[in-house]
Amino acid sequence: MHVTIEYVIMIPLLILGTFLFPIFANAVMNTWVNSRQTLALQNVAGQLGSAVQQLYFSLNHDSVPSGTVTYSPGLPPFIESSFYMGDATLSSSASPGSSPSFLQLTVTLVGTSNSVTTTVILGSNVLWQPSIFMSNSTDACVTAQKFSNGTILLWFGG
C-alpha cells in the first residue's frame, strides 16, 4: 500500500520536474547571455566615446592646423556573432558662449534588444555630422575635420 502512495506522489513530481527544469534553465541562460552582451556593449560604447573625445581634444588646440584626421578605434567587429551599430546626437547646454556640448552615443547589438548609451563631453566649437558606426565594416572609424575658424566636425566612417 505504501509503495502505491509513493508512486502516486513521485510520478507527477518527476513529470513536473522534467518540464520545469528546461524552462528554468532557459530563463537563467537568457538572463546570463543578455547581461554578458550588455557588459560587452558598455565596453564598446566607452571605448568609442573615448575615441571621439580624444580625437576632439587632440585637434582642439591653436597649434594644430586645419585638416582631417581619421582614427580606427580597433574595436571587435562582432559581439557573440552579432555586429553592432553606433549612433550619436549632439546637444548643447542651455547657456551660450563657452559652455560644453554633449554627445550622446548609443550602441545597439543588431538582432537583440540590447542597447547602451554613454555621454561624451566636448567643447563649444564642435559639430556632429549624423552618421552610423557599423562594427562589421572594414573601414569603421571616427573622423574629425578641423576648420580654419577652429570648429571641429566629427562623424563616424564606415
What are these regions (language model features)?
Residues 55-78:
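Short, glycine/small-hydrophobic-rich surface segments
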Residues 5-46, 57-59:
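Aliphatic-rich helix starts adjacent to a transmembrane/signal segment
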